[in-house]
Amino acid sequence: MIRELPSQRHIDILVHDFFRNVAWHYDIVDEAAFMNQLAQWRRLTHDQFKRGPDALPTTLRSFPALLFQVLAQALLFQPAQHIETLNDLKYAVDMELSDRAAEYSDAGRRLASSFRKSEPTLTGVQAELMRACFEKTTGAVIEAWHTLGTAIRDAQELGLHLIEPDSTTYSRSAKSSDREMGRNVWLILHLWDAHMGIVLGRPMSTRMSPNDVASPMSSRDSSGNQRPPQPRDVILCGYHTAYKFLQEIHDLEKLEDWRIPVDKIHETILTNIANLPGWATVQRSRQGEPPWLSAALETMYTNVQFVVFALHRPFIFAEPNSRHKAFDAAMQILESQGRLFDQTEPLQYKAFSLVFATFDAMVLVAAVHIRFPDELREQFTATRRILELGIERLKSLQARKNVLANSALSIVERLYQKMLATVYPEETLDNGQGGTDDGSFTIMETETVGANWGTILQPDLGDVLVPQPMNELLRSGYLAQSLSTSPSLPAAYGQDQFGMSIMGSFGCDSMPYNITDDTLHGAK
């Protein structure tokens, strides 16, 4: 498998591109440490390779697995005007760089699986987490969840969850220690565990105390000079603003009275947003700003609002206050996603992260207007505009063969038209109002992920459980086969039962929706 690595020239190009364009997303791999490992790797002799993995230094056995994942991510996020020599990596006329990226990532996965049988290493955990990044980005979300579980278990085997921070303030030195990087990797593992647990309705396997997470660095160094923020600063800023509450939100189902903790978390997040450091605010000075920072902060804004969104979504049908707050968070998510999309290269449109937050937020916004047409009417003009922009974004992603965007678009377009018909019943769809393409509504129902929104958005909806649209899209769409092999785990708030009814509102036969007494009690 080592022979599948590209030439040194191509490796150098892609490694440079990775740390310039991609690494800031999660800050999983430290550049100085990685380059040191790469230099050591290149000093290995042919004889060492011939004698097999046991002849390699322990610290380098997992390195090629990580290298393959770095190359894969770099290829996946190449700009449209990429270096011409990268086309040499293609060996067929119809290949794209993303095809080669998938092959490299698969090779890295096979190597990581081979070395897991021996002693786990931090480099191996990084390789597994990078593989989960690739799977999530390319739409294999269920597979990413399984890979994440493997990485978490190996990290626990290494004791990464037991490492205490050396300082209450994050410090980026010229060379990151294994201890510091291990702690950083564990934080990302925890955040992914919490986020995917909420999105997929799965149990969490990690816990983390906010007291054990360092704060972002000051905007000035020890000499008082201005210093640019680092990717880790953005992640830590988002964590202490909102991400730290994800594990509490995941556990809300265990509480009899959820109103007090929900209100407390909401107010704390608002206070934290108001107290963001100057470099992280929308009103910040952009002079001398590193090129990655704008997209990183926009991603952070989306994720912070997602926490507010996730906090209130389970209660939108039972509590008007939560309904309005979830609606506001969804609108802010869509505005943030629009700004982020404007910064995204077309070649990155296959990245499924551009679908996740947009789809969930659009479904909730439309559902609230459909179910409660007399509420938030003053917001409807803005809602209509922002949904139309979201639909156009999904169409752009669909045109770049983003399969999940294709399924999401079919649902959202139908919800959009149902919303128009509900709020303004005098308007006819034949007039072409709404800004969407009428031809898209002639698609056969079997080509889309069905959703019985006509059934669930009825006047007696008060006791019906709240949807997890993205989870249902993954369960019912083209990823259903891979999901069917996944462990059957209960979803929070009984949302799997809710999802069973999401079949057929747009003309197909639907399954009957059965609600038990226990389910009704949980919903209330």
Task: Enumerate the predicted regions with their spans.
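C-terminal transcriptional activation/regulatory domains of eukaryotic transcription factors
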Residues: M1-T123, R131-A140, R172-S176, S222-P229, ...
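Hydrophobic/aromatic-lined pockets within catalytic cores
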Residues: A23, R116, C133-A140, I152, ...
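Short coil/turn segments at secondary-structure boundaries
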Residues: I28-M35, E84-L86, T121, L200-P203, ...
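Fungal transcription factor middle regulatory core
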Residues: N36-A39, P79-A80, E84-K90, A155-Q287, ...
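Long, amphipathic alpha-helical regulatory blocks in the mid-to-C-terminal portion
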Residues: E96-E128, T147-T168, I188, S215-S222, ...
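Eukaryote-biased recognition of C-terminal alpha-helical segments
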Residues: V368, E388-G450
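Intrinsically disordered, low-complexity transcriptional activation domains
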Residues: R400, L429-K524
